[in-house]
Amino acid sequence: MKTIMIIENNQTYHNIYKTMLKDNDYKFIHTYDGYEAMERMDETTPDLIILDMLMDMITGDTFFMYLRNIPEYANIPVIIISSAPERLYNHLRITDPNLAFIEKRSLDEETLIREIDKKLSFQESTRRIVSRLPEAPAPDTKSASVVDNSNN
């Protein structure tokens, strides 16, 4: 069973996500801001994160940048669900295939579960491909030559 971390400061939305995830056999971890999420990630690394952007303490933007700069967390899929317009976050999606966006006003269970399944499937496919790649050979430092350009 996959674990999803919900980072949302609104209790009503927490309850909505909880119902949607339980109905589709996902485990979930509730957090109410980016700071609490950072602390909880030390205990449990989720398979996917649902992230609100407009929060107190540590905002969604700050948490997202933190997440992408920690190697162990950098490839965790994130679904931003925000009341802010999607166009504000297009620059992030262009460079991050593990990111999706859903506007809160158009949120429904089918859309959320489809995005979750799509991101988790992409993550699993990527893992399988990477696991089949041969390891890069270590550089051969003995045969490397040093060029002396002091006479030029």
Indicate where each model-derived feature is located:
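Active-site beta3 strand of CheY-like receiver
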Residues: 44-50
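Alpha4 helix (beta4-alpha4-beta5 surface) of REC/receiver domains from two-component response regulators
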Residues: 62, 84-118
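The feature encodes the CheY-like receiver
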Residues: 56-57, 86
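Helix N-cap/capping motif at the beta->alpha junctions
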Residues: 30-39, 60
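Conserved acidic carboxylate
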Residues: 8
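Short amphipathic alpha-helix used as the core "switch/output" element in two-component signaling
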Residues: 39, 61-74
